[in-house]
UniProtKB/Swiss-Prot annotation:
UniProt cross-references to Pfam families, sorted A to Z: Galactosyl_T (PF01762)
Disulfide bonds: none
Family according to the record: Belongs to the glycosyltransferase 31 family.
Gene: b3gnt5-b
Record's subcellular location: Golgi apparatus membrane
Main location: Golgi
Pathway: Protein modification; protein glycosylation
Residues that span the membrane, as ranges: 14-30
Stretches in topological domain Lumenal: 31-377
Known catalytic reactions: a beta-D-Gal-(1->4)-beta-D-Glc-(1<->1)-Cer(d18:1(4E)) + UDP-N-acetyl-alpha-D-glucosamine = a beta-D-GlcNAc-(1->3)-beta-D-Gal-(1->4)-beta-D-Glc-(1<->1)-Cer(d18:1(4E)) + UDP + H(+); a neolactoside nLc4Cer(d18:1(4E)) + UDP-N-acetyl-alpha-D-glucosamine = a neolactoside IV(3)-beta-GlcNAc-nLc4Cer(d18:1(4E)) + UDP + H(+)
Protein name: Lactosylceramide 1,3-N-acetyl-beta-D-glucosaminyltransferase B
Positions of glycan attachment: 56, 167, 275
Keywords: Glycoprotein, Glycosyltransferase, Golgi apparatus, Membrane, Signal-anchor, Transferase, Transmembrane, Transmembrane helix
CC annotations in GO: Golgi membrane
Length: 377
């Protein structure tokens, strides 16, 4: 009994010493602009951010003072896109006015509604969300091009805010406001950048497998305990007066994520009483969701910043891949080839693809797209 008591006191002493060491180290480095230190501090802080309401309270504004997207008028609006239809997935593509080539490439590949309807018996709707050309010299000509483009494809949603990086939160509010007003019956809503490849067949198959009344659903590449960037040289710079806390609430990368319709409604509701000056849209999305008690779920095949490895064993499970401009057509043909499924089918196929995926995703220093854990899923 005496030995046990001594061991207990020794363990307690070691824990106390370790805690003092960590606290002392953090105190010494607190003034350092060190990325690793900032991440350690912010990740330690994330429990408070995710569990309590002081962040939401500090960013809240009265509803009548909200400066959201409701104050901007629609210049182009396809309000009947979802009318009287049972929509499985409403897919918003965030785009810029000048990116017509990207939009055309998406329409022919992963955003092809007719292809998904005929091959997978699923009704998806793809719309492009954008603001207005920021260059006044080009604005009139560009706007006329957009009007003509929409006459042909009927898939643009545009409001009259300037289409800039610092207005991405307005583009987020445009999306969720449009869902709330014109497509509230869509079961799932996706937001994606226009340089993303979305494996819509895999995504649709996955969404169809979920329970009919799936709720509180939010999947993507989750960032946990991310610190605000305080360097003015970064385009992600956020000053203390805009966001004073050491960590953001958990959120999914804005490049691509999917939510259920109840989450879309909750985010829209929360956005009506939050200060929208925080221009990093995926962080603002996390703040809205946190206010409503919605937690993001990490999906290993939603990509990070880099491109997915080009291999059939990856295509079989991929959901998104980032950074695709000139290769969408090639990747679409490769990823949807009928031989992809047959290659990984059966016991030997599963073993083969498991080995290949481990070799592709578990290399030391490889952090571009999917985590090593994806190889084992």
């Amino acid at each position: 009994m005496l030995i046990s008591a001594r061991r207990l006191r020794r363990c307690q002493s070691l824990q106390l010493l370790a805690s003092c060491f960590v606290l002392s180290l953090m105190a010494l480095l607190v003034q350092e602009d060190n990325s690793l230190v900032n991440h350690v501090k912010s990740y330690s802080y994330r429990y408070l951010i995710n569990s309590y309401n002081f962040v939401n309270d500090s960013l809240s504004v009265p509803r009548d003072r909200s400066d959201g997207a409701a104050g901007y008028r629609y210049l182009i609006n396809n309000r009947h896109k979802c009318l009287n239809e049972d929509v499985l997935l409403l897919l918003f593509v965030k785009t810029a006015p000048e990116n017509r080539r990207r939009r055309n490439a998406i329409r022919k590949t992963w955003g092809n509604e007719d292809y998904i309807r005929s091959r997978y018996a699923a009704n998806i709707k793809v719309v492009f969300a954008l603001g207005v050309e920021r260059d006044p010299v080009k604005s009139h000509h560009t706007q006329q091009d957009l009007v003509n483009e929409n006459k042909r494809f009927k898939d643009l949603i545009q409001q009259d805010f300037s289409d800039t990086f610092h207005n991405l939160t307005l583009k987020l509010l445009l999306q969720f406001g449009w869902v709330n007003s014109f497509c509230p019956s869509a079961k799932f809503i996706m937001s994606a950048d226009d340089d993303i490849f979305v494996h819509t067949p895999n995504l649709v198959t996955y969404l169809k497998s979920l329970p009919i009344e799936t709720q509180d659903f939010w999947i993507g590449r989750v960032h946990r305990g991310s610190p605000p960037i305080r360097s003015k040289a970064s385009k992600y710079y956020v000053p203390y007066e805009m966001y004073p806390w050491s960590s953001y609430p958990d959120y999914t990368a804005g490049a691509a994520y999917v939510v259920s319709r109840d989450v879309a409604a909750k985010v829209y509701e929360a956005s009506q009483t939050l200060n929208t000056s925080l221009y990093i849209d995926d962080v603002f999305m996390g703040i809205c969701a946190n206010k409503m008690g919605v937690v993001p779920q990490y999906h290993v095949y939603f990509s990070g910043e880099g491109k997915s490895p080009y291999h059939p064993c990856i295509y079989n499970k991929m959901m998104t891949s980032h950074g695709h401009l000139g290769d969408l057509d090639y990747l679409w043909r490769q990823a949807t080839d009928s031989n992809v499924k047959s290659l990984s089918s059966g016991f030997l196929g599963n073993v083969y693809c498991k080995i290949v995926n481990i070799m592709l995703l578990c290399k030391i220093g490889y952090v571009d797209t999917y985590p090593c854990s994806a190889a084992w899923s």
